[in-house]
Design a protein with these regions (language model features):
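Preference for protein termini
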Residues: 1-270
Length: 270
């Protein structure tokens, strides 16, 4: 019996399923903290989730030294390209490398289909909500949301009341922060609707994985993501009624925490 400690910045726990018993698993101990603050040690059998099995087999066969070297190569690559970010609230303004993880978070096709439907529904609802707030305000008149909660919000723009936006679309791009809890269900932490950032890190991380771990992509059917900038450009062009519009990506400058993303997306969109 031993205690498994996941490596830093790793999806190790995500890969494992606490099965309770089973010959294929490994006996481990984990510590659980109750709502009252008491810490209990639980013994259980752990093994890879079904959709992680092929990756787990590869990870078992791969030498630790090889993984360490590839992780170092990833850090060196990111540093050379300048893929850094600053943490909000960090007074020192220290730039940090994007964290890389040799254990990817694997989402099955069925899970992604479920998430896609839910996110589409959520963004549609947000657009309907904003359209109502700036026009008929039925939700306020019905008392479903206190009027002062809307009108007292710093982001509420009175100048937008009655303004017709193209295609009734108030939110064209959104970054929805999602987590999966211990019960296996997905939860939304927050909706980033104004200037969502972070997609460039995902795109570069995928590119890095394909470069340093090509054998993984030969054995797995992984959906592509590199077409995102083209979809973004199409979305921005469709946000106006002007024929053949010119799209411009503005940035506060190189000292902004998301400057790498601004330059990356501008270059990718041409």
């Amino acid at each position: 019996m031993h205690t498994i400690k996941p490596p830093p910045a790793s999806h190790y726990d995500e890969m494992l399923a606490w099965t309770g018993a089973g010959p294929a698993g490994v006996q481990v101990q984990r510590q659980l903290q109750s709502s009252g603050g008491q810490v209990q040690t639980q013994t259980a059998t752990v093994g890879p989730r079904d959709h992680y099995a092929p990756y787990s087999d590869w990870l078992t066969r791969t030498a630790e030294q090889s993984l360490t070297q590839r992780r170092a190569q990833a850090d060196l690559l990111f540093r050379r390209i300048g893929i850094t970010f600053t943490v909000s609230g960090d007074d020192s303004g220290t730039e940090r490398l994007i964290p890389s993880d040799v254990i990817p978070r694997i989402i099955t096709a069925d899970e992604w289909s479920y998430l896609e439907r839910g996110l589409t529904q959520r963004v549609t609802a947000i657009n309907h909500f904003l359209a109502d707030i700036y026009h008929e305000q039925k939700i306020l008149k019905a008392g479903l949301i206190p009027r002062e909660q809307i009108e007292g919000n710093a982001q509420f723009q009175t100048k937008m009341i009655g303004v017709k936006v193209p295609h009734d679309t108030y939110v064209s791009i959104t970054g929805v922060d999602i987590v999966r809890n211990n019960d296996g269900k997905y939860y939304v932490l927050e909706d980033n609707l104004r200037v969502p950032s972070g997609v460039s890190y995902m795109l570069m991380n995928r590119k890095m994985m394909m470069r340093l771990f090509p054998e993984l992509f030969l054995k797995q059917t992984v959906r592509p993501v590199e077409h995102y900038p083209a979809l973004l450009l199409q979305t921005l062009r469709e946000a106006t009624d002007i024929d053949n519009p010119t799209v411009v990506l503005l940035t506060p400058g190189r000292y902004n925490s998301a400057y790498f993303e601004h330059t990356f997306l501008a270059q990718q969109m041409g």
